[in-house]
Amino acid sequence: MNINTKLLHAYPVICRETGASSIPKFQASTFHQSDVFKHEGYQYTRFGNPTITAVEECIKSLEDASYGLAFSSGVAAINAVLFLLSSGDHLVLGKNIYGGTYQTVHEFLIRFGIECTFVDESHVSAWEAAIQPNTKMFYLETPSNPLLTITDLEAVTKIAKTHQLLVACDNTFMTPLGQETLPLGIDIVIHSGTKFINGHSDVIAGLIATNDEALYQQLKIHQKALGGILAVEEGWLLLRGVKTMGLRMEKSILNAQTMAEYLQQKPQIKQVYYPGLATHRGYETHQKQAKNGGAVLSFELASEEHVHQLFENCQLPIVAVSLGGVESILSLPWCMSHASMPEEERLKMGVTPTLVRLSCGIEDIEDLIADFEQALQS
């Protein structure tokens, strides 16, 4: 089944009870039990809800996985995975990671007695060199946020399996449409459903898919006990938004590729980071494991003055945290997505005051380029 057909038909999209053309919002906190001594079906929305079940079936289908789980945010999904670790365990993860993941590591994992080592994710040998006797998990994010650094999924996963380690991967930037991670040996794939999967900047959601039943059961406990269940309203909106993901992504990816090529030619731009460019350091690896360059790019401006000029004069993109909406979103990671990181750590990973991230929407590309042209020339 091809992707746009799959997005419309490969999971519950019609209400079985009524034939309604969309899954209803089961806006209920609790469910009547016909037999108090035999608990069957739904009981309490924190434990499960028909609308949320449809969302979980959706991500399971999109990832061709055995199990799916929905959470209240991408961070809730990330935390559910990282909390598989126990005191005394060791975690290896890339140094170029999402700021929320970094915060969980430093605010919780280290305090809970879990050792963490950050490595240069683009060097396969760095992952193996970091393994200790108590290492339990590799945590990957490729392309990374915000520098679009590439990790060789197959090679790193092969190392992990040799040492009987779990491998989790944040696949938010590429989506299940652009990068299939589970077939490469990844144990758990994570998405911020807030981003491209929903695609309309009106939902906060996290999603997980896995083929391992034991991991699924443990993550299900985390979902329930940590209280990170997706709200019914959010789930219903996500089910609506995901139907157009194929069409949205096709346009956004084309816009990102064109914008990256345009920005490369501008004297005000020192560097463009986009894995769809042949000049990108991880281009060959990315081409091997992904279907396209994605819809997010970052670029380094020549000076902070140019940064102020761009943000003051750009008119079409909204200026905001997050990404993946139908509208283009411009952000400054230094004081937005990665602001919680110490300045020294931000600079070490390459997040500078002149690094700008652009999530491309579905606008006409001629208008986006014209807007950037006038902003850069102002």
Language-model features, listed with the residues they occupy:
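N-terminal glycine-rich, Lys/His-bearing helix-loop that initiates the first secondary-structure elements
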Residues: M1-Y42
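Conserved PLP-enzyme active-site core in the AAT-like
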Residues: L7, Y67-K266
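Glycine-rich phosphate/pyrophosphate-binding loop
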Residues: K25-F26, S34-A54, C58-S61, I329-T354
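Conserved N-terminal alpha-helix of the aminotransferase class I/II PLP-enzyme fold
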Residues: T30-A76, F83-L84, G100-E107
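Glycine-centered tight turns that cap/initiate beta-strands
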Residues: D64, Q268-Q271, T354
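PLP-dependent enzyme catalytic core of the Aspartate aminotransferase-like
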Residues: H106, E115, A129, P133, ...
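Short, well-ordered beta-strand elements within core beta-sheets of diverse protein domains
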Residues: L238-L247, G294-A302, R357-G361
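Conserved small-domain helix->loop->beta segment predominantly found in fold-type I
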Residues: Q257-Q315, V319-G324, M341-L347
